[in-house]
Protein backbone atom coordinates (compact mmCIF):
# COMPACT_ATOMS: atom_id res chain seq x y z
CA UNK A 1 0.00 0.00 0.00
CA UNK A 2 1.44 3.36 -1.03
CA UNK A 3 0.33 6.97 -1.33
CA UNK A 4 2.44 9.72 -2.92
CA UNK A 5 1.45 13.36 -3.14
CA UNK A 6 3.37 16.13 -4.88
CA UNK A 7 2.09 19.63 -4.10
CA UNK A 8 3.08 23.25 -4.52
CA UNK A 9 5.09 24.42 -1.53
CA UNK A 10 3.57 27.90 -1.72
CA UNK A 11 0.10 26.47 -1.14
CA UNK A 12 1.06 24.89 2.19
CA UNK A 13 0.78 21.25 3.16
CA UNK A 14 -2.63 19.60 3.09
CA UNK A 15 -3.81 16.84 5.38
CA UNK A 16 -2.92 13.25 4.45
CA UNK A 17 -4.75 9.95 5.02
CA UNK A 18 -4.29 8.56 8.51
CA UNK A 19 -3.42 4.88 8.98
CA UNK A 20 -1.42 3.05 11.61
CA UNK A 21 -0.28 0.65 8.86
CA UNK A 22 1.53 3.34 6.88
CA UNK A 23 4.84 5.03 7.61
CA UNK A 24 5.14 8.66 6.56
CA UNK A 25 8.05 10.28 4.75
CA UNK A 26 8.06 13.98 3.91
CA UNK A 27 10.57 15.89 1.80
CA UNK A 28 10.65 19.55 0.75
CA UNK A 29 12.36 20.79 -2.39
CA UNK A 30 12.74 24.28 -3.79
CA UNK A 31 9.13 24.41 -4.98
CA UNK A 32 7.50 21.14 -4.00
CA UNK A 33 6.44 19.19 -0.95
CA UNK A 34 6.47 15.42 -1.40
CA UNK A 35 4.56 13.25 1.05
CA UNK A 36 4.83 9.46 0.92
CA UNK A 37 2.88 6.95 2.99
CA UNK A 38 4.00 3.32 2.63
CA UNK A 39 3.57 -0.08 4.25
CA UNK A 40 5.96 -3.05 4.38
CA UNK A 41 4.21 -5.55 2.09
CA UNK A 42 4.78 -4.16 -1.42
CA UNK A 43 6.09 -0.62 -0.98
CA UNK A 44 9.64 0.64 -1.38
CA UNK A 45 11.02 4.16 -0.89
CA UNK A 46 14.60 5.31 -1.52
CA UNK A 47 16.68 7.84 -3.41
CA UNK A 48 19.20 7.96 -6.22
CA UNK A 49 21.20 10.94 -7.50
CA UNK A 50 19.03 13.41 -5.63
CA UNK A 51 15.75 11.99 -6.87
CA UNK A 52 13.12 10.15 -4.84
CA UNK A 53 12.55 6.57 -6.02
CA UNK A 54 9.44 4.77 -4.81
CA UNK A 55 6.76 2.30 -5.87
CA UNK A 56 5.68 -1.28 -5.30
CA UNK A 57 7.52 -4.57 -5.78
CA UNK A 58 6.66 -8.21 -5.18
CA UNK A 59 10.21 -8.92 -3.96
CA UNK A 60 12.62 -7.02 -1.66
CA UNK A 61 14.86 -4.38 -3.30
CA UNK A 62 18.13 -2.75 -2.20
CA UNK A 63 19.62 0.64 -3.08
CA UNK A 64 21.53 -0.78 -6.05
CA UNK A 65 18.29 -2.26 -7.43
CA UNK A 66 16.60 1.15 -7.22
CA UNK A 67 19.44 3.03 -8.95
CA UNK A 68 19.67 0.37 -11.64
CA UNK A 69 15.92 0.62 -12.26
CA UNK A 70 16.14 4.42 -12.40
CA UNK A 71 18.94 4.16 -14.95
CA UNK A 72 16.87 1.73 -17.05
CA UNK A 73 13.90 4.07 -16.92
CA UNK A 74 15.94 7.13 -17.91
CA UNK A 75 17.44 5.24 -20.85
CA UNK A 76 14.48 3.36 -22.27
CA UNK A 77 11.34 4.44 -20.46
CA UNK A 78 11.06 0.88 -19.12
CA UNK A 79 12.04 -0.94 -15.94
CA UNK A 80 13.75 -4.28 -16.57
CA UNK A 81 13.38 -5.63 -13.02
CA UNK A 82 10.16 -7.61 -13.45
CA UNK A 83 9.49 -7.72 -9.71
CA UNK A 84 8.89 -3.96 -9.72
CA UNK A 85 5.17 -3.55 -10.37
CA UNK A 86 4.96 0.25 -10.09
CA UNK A 87 7.99 2.53 -10.39
CA UNK A 88 7.99 6.22 -9.45
CA UNK A 89 10.71 8.85 -9.98
CA UNK A 90 10.24 12.32 -8.42
CA UNK A 91 12.37 15.44 -8.75
CA UNK A 92 11.93 17.04 -5.31
CA UNK A 93 12.90 20.50 -6.57
CA UNK A 94 10.59 20.82 -9.58
CA UNK A 95 7.87 18.41 -8.45
CA UNK A 96 7.95 16.47 -11.72
CA UNK A 97 6.73 12.90 -11.20
CA UNK A 98 7.05 9.97 -13.60
CA UNK A 99 5.38 6.59 -13.11
CA UNK A 100 5.73 3.30 -14.98
CA UNK A 101 3.30 0.43 -14.44
CA UNK A 102 4.75 -3.00 -15.17
CA UNK A 103 3.49 -4.86 -18.24
CA UNK A 104 2.21 -7.61 -15.96
CA UNK A 105 -0.16 -5.17 -14.26
CA UNK A 106 -1.21 -6.81 -10.96
CA UNK A 107 -0.85 -3.71 -8.75
CA UNK A 108 -3.13 -0.77 -9.57
CA UNK A 109 -1.83 2.74 -10.14
CA UNK A 110 -4.63 5.17 -9.29
CA UNK A 111 -4.01 8.88 -9.78
CA UNK A 112 -5.66 12.27 -9.44
CA UNK A 113 -4.42 15.70 -10.42
CA UNK A 114 -5.87 18.94 -9.10
CA UNK A 115 -4.75 22.54 -8.91
CA UNK A 116 -1.04 22.39 -8.06
CA UNK A 117 -1.19 18.82 -6.74
CA UNK A 118 -0.72 15.28 -8.08
CA UNK A 119 -1.52 12.12 -6.11
CA UNK A 120 -0.72 8.49 -6.89
CA UNK A 121 -2.11 5.74 -4.69
CA UNK A 122 -2.40 1.97 -4.78
CA UNK A 123 -5.87 2.19 -3.18
CA UNK A 124 -8.80 4.45 -4.04
CA UNK A 125 -9.63 4.81 -0.35
CA UNK A 126 -6.40 6.74 0.14
CA UNK A 127 -7.66 9.30 -2.38
CA UNK A 128 -11.01 9.87 -0.65
CA UNK A 129 -10.16 13.26 0.86
CA UNK A 130 -8.19 14.44 -2.18
CA UNK A 131 -11.21 14.04 -4.49
CA UNK A 132 -13.75 15.42 -2.01
CA UNK A 133 -15.21 12.02 -1.15
CA UNK A 134 -15.72 8.92 -3.28
CA UNK A 135 -18.61 9.16 -5.74
CA UNK A 136 -19.70 6.71 -8.42
CA UNK A 137 -19.16 8.07 -11.93
CA UNK A 138 -22.64 7.50 -13.37
CA UNK A 139 -21.34 7.78 -16.94
CA UNK A 140 -19.13 4.71 -16.33
CA UNK A 141 -21.93 2.47 -15.04
CA UNK A 142 -23.22 1.20 -18.44
CA UNK A 143 -19.76 -0.06 -19.44
CA UNK A 144 -19.25 -1.60 -15.99
CA UNK A 145 -22.53 -3.53 -16.13
CA UNK A 146 -21.93 -4.92 -19.62
CA UNK A 147 -18.27 -5.94 -19.28
CA UNK A 148 -17.99 -6.23 -15.45
CA UNK A 149 -14.91 -3.97 -15.48
CA UNK A 150 -13.78 -0.70 -17.04
CA UNK A 151 -11.01 -0.25 -19.58
CA UNK A 152 -8.29 1.96 -18.09
CA UNK A 153 -7.66 4.79 -17.56
CA UNK A 154 -11.30 4.97 -16.50
CA UNK A 155 -12.45 3.87 -13.04
CA UNK A 156 -15.88 3.63 -11.45
CA UNK A 157 -15.09 6.66 -9.26
CA UNK A 158 -15.40 10.26 -10.34
CA UNK A 159 -12.08 12.12 -10.45
CA UNK A 160 -9.89 9.01 -10.15
CA UNK A 161 -8.03 7.48 -13.09
CA UNK A 162 -6.03 4.26 -13.45
CA UNK A 163 -2.80 3.75 -15.40
CA UNK A 164 -3.01 0.81 -17.85
CA UNK A 165 -0.43 -1.96 -17.53
CA UNK A 166 2.67 -1.29 -19.62
CA UNK A 167 2.01 2.46 -19.73
CA UNK A 168 3.99 5.41 -18.38
CA UNK A 169 2.76 8.66 -16.86
CA UNK A 170 4.58 11.99 -16.76
CA UNK A 171 3.23 14.96 -14.80
CA UNK A 172 4.50 18.36 -13.73
CA UNK A 173 1.62 19.47 -11.49
CA UNK A 174 3.26 22.68 -10.29
CA UNK A 175 3.15 24.07 -13.83
CA UNK A 176 -0.42 22.89 -14.39
CA UNK A 177 0.65 20.36 -17.04
CA UNK A 178 -1.95 17.64 -17.49
CA UNK A 179 -0.63 14.10 -16.93
CA UNK A 180 0.75 12.59 -20.13
CA UNK A 181 -0.01 8.88 -20.61
CA UNK A 182 2.09 6.89 -23.09
CA UNK A 183 1.91 3.20 -23.97
CA UNK A 184 5.18 1.28 -23.82
CA UNK A 185 3.72 -1.74 -25.60
CA UNK A 186 5.63 -2.61 -28.74
CA UNK A 187 5.36 -5.80 -30.75
CA UNK A 188 8.70 -5.21 -32.41
CA UNK A 189 9.44 -7.75 -35.10
CA UNK A 190 7.08 -10.70 -35.33
CA UNK A 191 8.86 -13.99 -34.69
CA UNK A 192 8.39 -16.19 -37.72
CA UNK A 193 6.92 -19.61 -37.23
CA UNK A 194 9.53 -22.03 -36.04
CA UNK A 195 9.58 -25.37 -34.36
CA UNK A 196 7.05 -25.71 -31.56
CA UNK A 197 9.79 -27.43 -29.56
CA UNK A 198 11.84 -24.22 -29.63
CA UNK A 199 8.92 -22.20 -28.30
CA UNK A 200 8.29 -24.76 -25.56
CA UNK A 201 11.94 -24.68 -24.52
CA UNK A 202 11.90 -20.89 -24.21
CA UNK A 203 8.60 -20.82 -22.30
CA UNK A 204 9.81 -23.48 -19.88
CA UNK A 205 13.05 -21.57 -19.33
CA UNK A 206 11.19 -18.37 -18.43
CA UNK A 207 8.70 -20.10 -16.14
CA UNK A 208 11.41 -22.06 -14.36
CA UNK A 209 13.47 -18.94 -13.78
CA UNK A 210 10.40 -17.09 -12.49
CA UNK A 211 9.61 -19.94 -10.11
CA UNK A 212 13.22 -20.24 -8.96
CA UNK A 213 13.04 -16.60 -7.83
CA UNK A 214 10.12 -17.52 -5.57
CA UNK A 215 12.26 -20.20 -3.95
CA UNK A 216 14.72 -17.51 -2.78
CA UNK A 217 12.08 -16.10 -0.44
CA UNK A 218 12.50 -19.16 1.83
CA UNK A 219 8.92 -18.83 3.05
CA UNK A 220 5.94 -21.16 2.63
CA UNK A 221 4.30 -20.94 -0.81
CA UNK A 222 0.72 -21.89 -1.63
CA UNK A 223 -0.34 -22.95 -5.13
CA UNK A 224 -3.97 -22.47 -6.11
CA UNK A 225 -4.48 -25.77 -7.90
CA UNK A 226 -7.82 -26.20 -9.64
CA UNK A 227 -6.58 -29.33 -11.36
CA UNK A 228 -6.85 -27.76 -14.80
CA UNK A 229 -3.98 -27.53 -17.25
CA UNK A 230 -2.81 -24.00 -16.38
CA UNK A 231 -2.41 -24.51 -12.63
CA UNK A 232 -1.08 -28.07 -13.03
CA UNK A 233 1.76 -26.77 -15.21
CA UNK A 234 2.72 -24.26 -12.52
CA UNK A 235 2.70 -27.11 -10.03
CA UNK A 236 4.98 -29.14 -12.29
CA UNK A 237 7.37 -26.18 -12.63
CA UNK A 238 7.46 -25.81 -8.83
CA UNK A 239 8.22 -29.52 -8.56
CA UNK A 240 10.99 -29.26 -11.15
CA UNK A 241 12.57 -26.33 -9.28
CA UNK A 242 12.20 -28.00 -5.86
CA UNK A 243 9.96 -25.22 -4.58
CA UNK A 244 8.12 -26.59 -1.53
CA UNK A 245 4.44 -25.81 -1.97
CA UNK A 246 1.14 -26.67 -0.42
CA UNK A 247 -1.67 -26.84 -2.95
CA UNK A 248 -5.13 -25.55 -2.21
CA UNK A 249 -8.45 -25.36 -4.02
CA UNK A 250 -11.90 -24.08 -3.23
CA UNK A 251 -15.20 -25.86 -3.41
CA UNK A 252 -18.88 -24.98 -3.35
CA UNK A 253 -20.13 -28.48 -2.64
CA UNK A 254 -22.21 -27.32 0.34
CA UNK A 255 -24.40 -25.30 -2.03
CA UNK A 256 -24.25 -27.10 -5.38
CA UNK A 257 -23.80 -30.70 -4.25
CA UNK A 258 -21.19 -31.05 -7.02
CA UNK A 259 -17.74 -32.09 -5.80
CA UNK A 260 -16.21 -32.32 -9.27
CA UNK A 261 -13.90 -29.35 -8.79
CA UNK A 262 -12.37 -30.88 -5.67
CA UNK A 263 -11.87 -34.26 -7.33
CA UNK A 264 -10.25 -32.53 -10.29
CA UNK A 265 -7.80 -30.73 -8.01
CA UNK A 266 -7.05 -33.76 -5.85
CA UNK A 267 -6.17 -35.90 -8.87
CA UNK A 268 -3.66 -33.30 -10.08
CA UNK A 269 -2.18 -32.86 -6.60
CA UNK A 270 -1.72 -36.61 -6.23
CA UNK A 271 0.17 -36.76 -9.51
CA UNK A 272 2.39 -33.84 -8.46
CA UNK A 273 3.02 -35.27 -5.01
CA UNK A 274 1.57 -32.26 -3.19
CA UNK A 275 -0.22 -32.07 0.13
CA UNK A 276 -3.61 -30.72 -0.91
CA UNK A 277 -6.48 -29.13 0.97
CA UNK A 278 -9.95 -28.14 -0.20
CA UNK A 279 -11.64 -25.09 1.28
CA UNK A 280 -15.42 -25.52 0.99
CA UNK A 281 -17.85 -22.63 1.39
CA UNK A 282 -21.46 -22.53 2.52
CA UNK A 283 -23.99 -20.09 1.08
CA UNK A 284 -23.68 -17.63 3.96
CA UNK A 285 -19.88 -17.92 3.75
CA UNK A 286 -20.09 -16.76 0.15
CA UNK A 287 -22.43 -13.86 0.87
CA UNK A 288 -20.18 -12.61 3.67
CA UNK A 289 -17.12 -13.00 1.44
CA UNK A 290 -18.83 -11.08 -1.36
CA UNK A 291 -19.28 -8.15 1.02
CA UNK A 292 -15.69 -8.33 2.32
CA UNK A 293 -14.21 -8.82 -1.16
CA UNK A 294 -15.88 -5.75 -2.67
CA UNK A 295 -14.66 -3.67 0.27
CA UNK A 296 -11.10 -5.03 -0.10
CA UNK A 297 -11.00 -4.74 -3.90
CA UNK A 298 -12.57 -1.25 -3.69
CA UNK A 299 -14.65 -1.97 -6.78
CA UNK A 300 -17.11 -4.53 -8.17
CA UNK A 301 -15.25 -7.85 -8.17
CA UNK A 302 -15.84 -8.92 -11.82
CA UNK A 303 -15.98 -12.72 -11.43
CA UNK A 304 -18.23 -14.76 -9.14
CA UNK A 305 -15.05 -16.70 -8.41
CA UNK A 306 -13.59 -13.61 -6.73
CA UNK A 307 -15.91 -14.07 -3.77
CA UNK A 308 -14.73 -17.66 -3.40
CA UNK A 309 -11.06 -16.70 -3.61
CA UNK A 310 -11.55 -13.90 -1.11
CA UNK A 311 -12.87 -16.40 1.44
CA UNK A 312 -10.04 -18.80 0.65
CA UNK A 313 -7.41 -16.08 1.20
CA UNK A 314 -8.99 -15.03 4.50
CA UNK A 315 -9.71 -18.42 6.00
CA UNK A 316 -8.09 -21.19 3.97
CA UNK A 317 -4.38 -20.34 3.97
CA UNK A 318 -1.83 -21.29 6.58
CA UNK A 319 -0.74 -18.49 8.90
CA UNK A 320 2.83 -18.52 7.49
CA UNK A 321 1.85 -18.63 3.82
CA UNK A 322 3.02 -15.28 2.43
CA UNK A 323 3.15 -16.07 -1.30
CA UNK A 324 0.25 -17.48 -3.33
CA UNK A 325 0.74 -18.68 -6.93
CA UNK A 326 -2.17 -18.27 -9.34
CA UNK A 327 -2.49 -19.39 -12.98
CA UNK A 328 -4.47 -16.42 -14.29
CA UNK A 329 -3.47 -14.95 -17.72
CA UNK A 330 -2.54 -18.26 -19.39
CA UNK A 331 -5.36 -18.24 -21.95
CA UNK A 332 -4.68 -14.81 -23.41
CA UNK A 333 -0.86 -14.99 -23.51
CA UNK A 334 -0.78 -18.55 -24.93
CA UNK A 335 -3.44 -17.84 -27.56
CA UNK A 336 -6.22 -19.92 -26.01
CA UNK A 337 -9.87 -19.03 -25.47
CA UNK A 338 -11.28 -17.21 -28.48
CA UNK A 339 -8.04 -17.15 -30.48
CA UNK A 340 -8.09 -20.60 -32.15
CA UNK A 341 -11.46 -19.91 -33.79
CA UNK A 342 -10.32 -16.41 -34.81
CA UNK A 343 -7.20 -17.89 -36.37
CA UNK A 344 -8.96 -20.73 -38.18
CA UNK A 345 -11.54 -18.34 -39.65
CA UNK A 346 -9.09 -15.50 -40.33
CA UNK A 347 -9.56 -15.58 -44.10
CA UNK A 348 -13.34 -15.34 -43.74
CA UNK A 349 -12.92 -12.59 -41.14
CA UNK A 350 -10.61 -10.68 -43.46
CA UNK A 351 -13.22 -10.98 -46.22
CA UNK A 352 -16.01 -9.87 -43.89
CA UNK A 353 -13.92 -6.84 -42.96
CA UNK A 354 -14.41 -5.47 -46.49
CA UNK A 355 -17.50 -3.75 -47.88
CA UNK A 356 -18.10 -6.33 -50.62
CA UNK A 357 -17.42 -9.20 -48.26
CA UNK A 358 -20.15 -8.01 -45.93
CA UNK A 359 -22.52 -7.27 -48.79
CA UNK A 360 -22.14 -10.72 -50.37
CA UNK A 361 -21.47 -13.06 -47.44
CA UNK A 362 -23.81 -11.68 -44.79
CA UNK A 363 -27.09 -12.57 -46.58
CA UNK A 364 -25.73 -16.08 -47.22
CA UNK A 365 -24.64 -16.68 -43.62
CA UNK A 366 -27.61 -15.08 -41.86
CA UNK A 367 -30.08 -18.01 -42.22
CA UNK A 368 -27.52 -20.39 -40.67
CA UNK A 369 -26.67 -18.13 -37.73
CA UNK A 370 -29.81 -19.05 -35.80
CA UNK A 371 -28.78 -22.70 -35.69
CA UNK A 372 -25.00 -22.44 -35.41
CA UNK A 373 -23.28 -20.15 -32.89
CA UNK A 374 -20.07 -20.32 -34.93
CA UNK A 375 -21.84 -18.73 -37.89
CA UNK A 376 -23.40 -16.08 -35.64
CA UNK A 377 -19.89 -15.35 -34.39
CA UNK A 378 -18.79 -14.58 -37.95
CA UNK A 379 -21.62 -12.10 -38.49
CA UNK A 380 -19.98 -9.56 -36.20
CA UNK A 381 -18.28 -6.64 -37.93
CA UNK A 382 -14.51 -7.12 -38.31
CA UNK A 383 -13.68 -4.00 -40.31
CA UNK A 384 -10.81 -1.69 -39.28
CA UNK A 385 -13.34 1.03 -38.50
CA UNK A 386 -14.48 1.11 -34.87
CA UNK A 387 -17.65 3.07 -35.67
CA UNK A 388 -19.92 0.11 -36.37
CA UNK A 389 -22.45 -0.96 -33.73
CA UNK A 390 -22.03 -4.70 -34.23
CA UNK A 391 -18.22 -4.71 -34.22
CA UNK A 392 -16.64 -7.85 -32.79
CA UNK A 393 -14.77 -5.85 -30.15
CA UNK A 394 -18.03 -4.65 -28.56
CA UNK A 395 -19.44 -8.17 -28.13
CA UNK A 396 -16.19 -9.76 -26.91
CA UNK A 397 -16.49 -10.53 -23.18
CA UNK A 398 -19.81 -8.65 -23.03
CA UNK A 399 -21.35 -10.54 -20.12
CA UNK A 400 -24.21 -8.17 -19.31
CA UNK A 401 -27.29 -7.47 -21.41
CA UNK A 402 -26.37 -4.53 -23.66
CA UNK A 403 -29.98 -3.98 -24.72
CA UNK A 404 -31.25 -3.90 -21.14
CA UNK A 405 -28.47 -1.54 -20.05
CA UNK A 406 -29.07 0.88 -22.93
CA UNK A 407 -32.82 0.91 -22.35
CA UNK A 408 -32.60 1.20 -18.55
CA UNK A 409 -30.14 4.09 -18.60
CA UNK A 410 -31.45 5.68 -21.79
CA UNK A 411 -28.04 5.74 -23.46
CA UNK A 412 -26.61 4.96 -26.87
CA UNK A 413 -24.00 2.33 -27.64
CA UNK A 414 -21.19 4.85 -27.21
CA UNK A 415 -21.86 5.02 -23.45
CA UNK A 416 -21.07 1.29 -23.28
CA UNK A 417 -18.11 1.04 -25.64
CA UNK A 418 -16.28 4.39 -25.42
CA UNK A 419 -13.71 3.03 -22.96
CA UNK A 420 -12.83 0.16 -25.28
CA UNK A 421 -12.85 2.30 -28.38
CA UNK A 422 -10.58 4.96 -26.84
CA UNK A 423 -8.12 2.27 -25.77
CA UNK A 424 -8.08 0.50 -29.15
CA UNK A 425 -7.60 3.74 -31.08
CA UNK A 426 -4.12 4.01 -29.51
CA UNK A 427 -3.15 0.82 -31.37
CA UNK A 428 -4.65 1.53 -34.78
CA UNK A 429 -1.71 0.04 -36.69
CA UNK A 430 -1.80 -3.28 -34.84
CA UNK A 431 -3.09 -6.46 -36.45
CA UNK A 432 -6.63 -7.57 -35.53
CA UNK A 433 -5.42 -10.60 -33.53
CA UNK A 434 -2.86 -8.52 -31.64
CA UNK A 435 -5.43 -5.84 -30.82
CA UNK A 436 -7.74 -8.52 -29.46
CA UNK A 437 -4.99 -10.00 -27.29
CA UNK A 438 -3.91 -6.64 -25.90
CA UNK A 439 -7.48 -5.56 -25.17
CA UNK A 440 -8.16 -8.80 -23.29
CA UNK A 441 -4.88 -8.65 -21.38
CA UNK A 442 -5.20 -4.95 -20.48
CA UNK A 443 -8.89 -5.28 -19.68
CA UNK A 444 -10.34 -8.53 -18.39
CA UNK A 445 -7.06 -10.18 -17.37
CA UNK A 446 -5.61 -7.11 -15.71
CA UNK A 447 -8.84 -6.40 -13.82
CA UNK A 448 -8.95 -10.00 -12.56
CA UNK A 449 -5.33 -10.01 -11.39
CA UNK A 450 -5.68 -6.57 -9.81
CA UNK A 451 -8.75 -7.63 -7.83
CA UNK A 452 -7.36 -11.00 -6.74
CA UNK A 453 -4.07 -9.39 -5.76
CA UNK A 454 -5.87 -6.88 -3.53
CA UNK A 455 -7.92 -9.66 -1.93
CA UNK A 456 -4.67 -11.40 -1.05
CA UNK A 457 -3.07 -8.17 0.12
CA UNK A 458 -5.92 -7.55 2.57
CA UNK A 459 -4.86 -10.78 4.30
CA UNK A 460 -1.14 -9.99 4.16
CA UNK A 461 -0.47 -12.27 1.14
CA UNK A 462 1.41 -11.52 -2.07
CA UNK A 463 -0.39 -13.14 -5.00
CA UNK A 464 1.93 -14.07 -7.88
CA UNK A 465 0.87 -14.62 -11.49
CA UNK A 466 3.77 -16.34 -13.32
CA UNK A 467 1.94 -16.33 -16.66
CA UNK A 468 1.92 -12.51 -16.61
CA UNK A 469 5.72 -12.29 -16.25
CA UNK A 470 6.70 -9.47 -18.68
CA UNK A 471 9.42 -11.58 -20.30
CA UNK A 472 6.93 -14.36 -21.00
CA UNK A 473 4.25 -11.93 -22.18
CA UNK A 474 6.73 -10.21 -24.52
CA UNK A 475 7.90 -13.52 -25.97
CA UNK A 476 4.42 -14.95 -26.52
CA UNK A 477 2.89 -11.71 -27.80
CA UNK A 478 5.50 -11.61 -30.57
CA UNK A 479 5.29 -15.32 -31.39
CA UNK A 480 3.44 -15.96 -34.65
CA UNK A 481 -0.25 -16.76 -34.28
CA UNK A 482 0.01 -19.96 -36.28
CA UNK A 483 2.26 -21.47 -33.62
CA UNK A 484 0.02 -20.31 -30.77
CA UNK A 485 -3.50 -20.71 -32.07
CA UNK A 486 -3.56 -23.27 -34.90
CA UNK A 487 -4.35 -26.00 -32.37
CA UNK A 488 -6.13 -25.10 -29.11
CA UNK A 489 -3.86 -25.39 -26.06
CA UNK A 490 -1.02 -26.68 -28.27
CA UNK A 491 1.76 -24.93 -26.34
CA UNK A 492 0.29 -25.56 -22.90
CA UNK A 493 -0.33 -29.24 -23.59
CA UNK A 494 3.19 -29.60 -24.99
CA UNK A 495 4.62 -27.83 -21.96
CA UNK A 496 2.70 -30.16 -19.66
CA UNK A 497 4.23 -33.20 -21.35
CA UNK A 498 7.75 -31.69 -21.17
CA UNK A 499 7.27 -31.27 -17.43
CA UNK A 500 6.18 -34.87 -16.93
CA UNK A 501 2.43 -34.46 -16.53
CA UNK A 502 0.37 -37.42 -17.77
CA UNK A 503 -1.74 -37.08 -20.91
CA UNK A 504 -5.04 -37.12 -19.02
CA UNK A 505 -4.02 -33.86 -17.31
CA UNK A 506 -2.39 -32.41 -20.43
CA UNK A 507 -5.61 -32.84 -22.41
CA UNK A 508 -8.32 -32.39 -19.78
CA UNK A 509 -10.87 -29.62 -20.39
CA UNK A 510 -11.20 -26.52 -18.24
CA UNK A 511 -13.79 -26.68 -15.45
CA UNK A 512 -15.63 -23.69 -14.09
CA UNK A 513 -14.28 -22.33 -10.81
CA UNK A 514 -17.61 -20.71 -9.96
CA UNK A 515 -21.13 -22.00 -9.50
CA UNK A 516 -24.17 -22.15 -11.80
CA UNK A 517 -26.68 -19.30 -12.03
CA UNK A 518 -29.53 -21.56 -10.92
CA UNK A 519 -28.18 -21.35 -7.37
CA UNK A 520 -27.99 -17.56 -7.19
CA UNK A 521 -29.86 -15.81 -9.99
CA UNK A 522 -33.42 -17.09 -9.55
CA UNK A 523 -36.04 -15.70 -7.13
CA UNK A 524 -35.50 -17.18 -3.68
CA UNK A 525 -31.90 -18.09 -4.53
CA UNK A 526 -28.68 -17.29 -2.72
CA UNK A 527 -28.70 -13.61 -3.73
CA UNK A 528 -32.34 -12.91 -2.81
CA UNK A 529 -31.44 -10.95 0.37
CA UNK A 530 -29.15 -8.71 -1.70
CA UNK A 531 -31.83 -8.23 -4.36
CA UNK A 532 -34.27 -7.10 -1.66
CA UNK A 533 -31.68 -4.78 -0.14
CA UNK A 534 -30.77 -3.27 -3.52
CA UNK A 535 -34.43 -2.41 -4.16
CA UNK A 536 -33.73 0.83 -2.32
CA UNK A 537 -31.39 1.89 -5.14
CA UNK A 538 -32.95 0.19 -8.17
CA UNK A 539 -36.50 -0.44 -9.35
CA UNK A 540 -37.67 -3.72 -7.68
CA UNK A 541 -39.51 -4.77 -10.86
CA UNK A 542 -36.37 -4.22 -12.93
CA UNK A 543 -34.34 -6.33 -10.50
CA UNK A 544 -36.97 -9.05 -10.61
CA UNK A 545 -36.86 -9.07 -14.41
CA UNK A 546 -33.17 -9.96 -14.18
CA UNK A 547 -33.72 -12.95 -11.87
CA UNK A 548 -33.60 -15.49 -14.66
CA UNK A 549 -31.41 -18.23 -16.09
CA UNK A 550 -30.85 -16.12 -19.20
CA UNK A 551 -27.12 -15.59 -18.92
CA UNK A 552 -26.81 -11.94 -19.96
CA UNK A 553 -29.64 -10.82 -17.68
CA UNK A 554 -28.31 -12.85 -14.73
CA UNK A 555 -24.90 -11.25 -15.22
CA UNK A 556 -26.50 -7.80 -15.31
CA UNK A 557 -28.09 -8.64 -11.96
CA UNK A 558 -24.66 -9.69 -10.65
CA UNK A 559 -23.27 -6.35 -11.80
CA UNK A 560 -26.04 -4.33 -10.17
CA UNK A 561 -25.63 -6.14 -6.84
CA UNK A 562 -21.87 -5.53 -6.96
CA UNK A 563 -22.50 -1.87 -7.70
CA UNK A 564 -25.00 -1.60 -4.85
CA UNK A 565 -22.58 -3.09 -2.32
CA UNK A 566 -19.71 -0.94 -3.59
CA UNK A 567 -21.84 2.18 -3.20
CA UNK A 568 -23.00 1.16 0.29
CA UNK A 569 -19.51 0.57 1.67
CA UNK A 570 -17.20 2.79 -0.37
CA UNK A 571 -19.42 5.81 -0.99
CA UNK A 572 -21.91 5.81 1.89
CA UNK A 573 -19.36 4.19 4.22
CA UNK A 574 -21.80 1.72 5.72
CA UNK A 575 -19.87 -0.92 7.65
CA UNK A 576 -19.63 -4.46 6.24
CA UNK A 577 -20.82 -5.80 9.60
CA UNK A 578 -24.07 -3.85 9.31
CA UNK A 579 -24.60 -5.21 5.79
CA UNK A 580 -23.94 -8.77 6.96
CA UNK A 581 -26.41 -8.37 9.82
CA UNK A 582 -29.09 -7.29 7.36
CA UNK A 583 -28.32 -10.28 5.12
CA UNK A 584 -28.69 -12.66 8.08
CA UNK A 585 -31.93 -10.98 9.16
CA UNK A 586 -33.48 -11.18 5.70
CA UNK A 587 -32.45 -14.82 5.28
CA UNK A 588 -33.99 -15.69 8.64
CA UNK A 589 -37.24 -13.92 7.74
CA UNK A 590 -37.41 -15.69 4.39
CA UNK A 591 -36.80 -19.10 5.98
CA UNK A 592 -39.45 -18.43 8.65
CA UNK A 593 -41.99 -17.69 5.94
Q: Predicted regions span which residues?
A:
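Cysteine-centered catalytic environments shared across enzyme families
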Residues: 1-298, 309, 585-590
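Structural motif
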Residues: 76-78, 131-139, 198, 426-440, ...
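Acidic, carboxylate-rich catalytic segments that either coordinate divalent cations
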Residues: 2, 533-593
